[in-house]
């Protein structure tokens, strides 16, 4: 079906960033925000060639005059027209390829609605005329990238966090847990606690500034109470950040209070369990015989696991929950921000995977529901 000389395209559409590139590469060629921006004001300069919408980095750079929208919320596509724009931008502007010449591997969140992947399939074949495509589950790809076939993946991105136990390459659906608490919620929370300090951030453009503060300055405390005491008694934890207009702000205990919400969702007014408890609950839903392997292979993946200190804190929290003799190992690969994409690149270039693609012919015969039979 698929010639060896044509590289497959791997597109990992995250809620926050889109990662795209060619199968067989060790990193994505294009990484850009999953944003579509539309002008807030009428264009007045004639002949300026203003567009009615901007995608990705261009939207980001013109954010002052645009309203920014994320078409993927909590890992699920909520606006298909905008999603199509992002894919179009990915193929034609970022990768500069003709999608009708390459098989495309897409990714999706676990426990995604079935209609969501059908629609993805339909758009790929009908709008972009791809010769073949496949939809893979993000967490499974992360595990591939870490060189394992058994383990539990805590995948936390911008829109959704999930814990996915995988045994010998099979995700165990009954034990997958999903937590709608991720990077975007932490950004919103940081906006809120910075407002309490007297800095006001409200617009969609300012939210992007706060996201940058979060990525550059936040970290996870090993002992939250102790860290709060340290922050209160000295200024050793304070850092300054220069805003785009040159104003300098000081950030103190917000640096670790923001990601602490991952472990204590009550900070955000949520009743759910933290990421440590969710991982533990997920392991406990698995067969007793495989738990040992899961505890010893807990893999972190996604941008929201990039905070310094998060692996040590997870180790501490899970050790407290697990049986006392259990060996617990948290694996936090340095490239975990892109491990979903890397796993996709590995998968799509395996010779054994080539018969797994859904071909245009199969799609024409069966329609979009083919995706449930071929991708699992």
From Swiss-Prot:
Keywords: Acetylation, ATP-binding, Cytoplasm, Cytoskeleton, Hydrolase, Nucleotide-binding. In this organism there are four genes coding for actin. The sequences coded by genes 1 and 3 are identical. There are a few variations in the actins coded by genes 2 and 4. It comes from the Eukaryota. It comes from Caenorhabditis elegans. It catalyses: ATP + H2O = ADP + phosphate + H(+). It is found in: Cytoplasm, Cytoskeleton. Residues 1-2 form a propeptide. GO terms for cellular component: actin cytoskeleton; actin filament; cell cortex; cytoplasm. Actins are highly conserved proteins that are involved in various types of cell motility and are ubiquitously expressed in all eukaryotic cells. One of its GO terms (molecular function) is hydrolase activity. SUPFAM superfamilies: Actin-like ATPase domain. The modification N-acetylaspartate is found at residue 3. The keyword Acetylation applies. Its main location: cytoplasm. This is Actin-2. It is an enzyme of class 3 (hydrolase). Its EC number is 3.6.4.-. GO terms for biological process: cortical actin cytoskeleton organization; embryo development ending in birth or egg hatching; locomotion; meiosis II cytokinesis; mitotic cytokinesis. Transmembrane segments: none annotated.
